[in-house]
């Protein structure tokens, strides 16, 4: 059974990698799922079995992205506040250069493809909404009360990600961006800790 799971994971990765390479080279709207399948050496049906929509091919880590804040809150230590858990998560991601932050080489090309595609912009907004909803569910047991807490916490996370994206797209040095964003994150989470 482990071999089968490994083969499925390898096929999924091959399809996602082929899709991203084509999208970065030609743009999202100029690539078909059939071309992705051909590049990944699978059938179109196989591509759709792994990725039900073309947008799923581009945002292949969407479930991880949607659940990251909620998982940090759910999995935190008993003494750690929800704000502390999200702060720790973001700073750990920043320290290790997590690919979803966009500090890696080529990140500006990824975000240019999103900017050029209304469909991808809409999907990015949907993913942000779903992440906020997942966080609200996770916070329900931790903080109770109004949904604004999840909106504020998710909003800070989105703002920090946007700062990274905008600075990298403007050609800033990734290490300088990392330092700037760390200072902003520390200040933002300090302020948020007073709300919880």
Residue map of PLM features:
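Basic, helix-initiating cap at the start of DNA-binding domains
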Residues: 1-42, 59, 68
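Short hydrophobic/aromatic patch on the recognition helix
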Residues: 43-51
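DNA major-groove recognition helix of helix-turn-helix
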Residues: 51, 62, 157
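Alpha-helical DNA-contacting segments of helix-turn-helix folds
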Residues: 55-65
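Hydrophobic alpha-helical connector segments
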Residues: 67-110
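Short, well-structured alpha-helical segments
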Residues: 87, 146-154, 158, 182
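Amphipathic alpha-helical packing segments from all-alpha helical-bundle domains
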Residues: 118-151
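C-terminal peripheral helix-coil segments that are non-catalytic and often amphipathic
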Residues: 162, 166-196
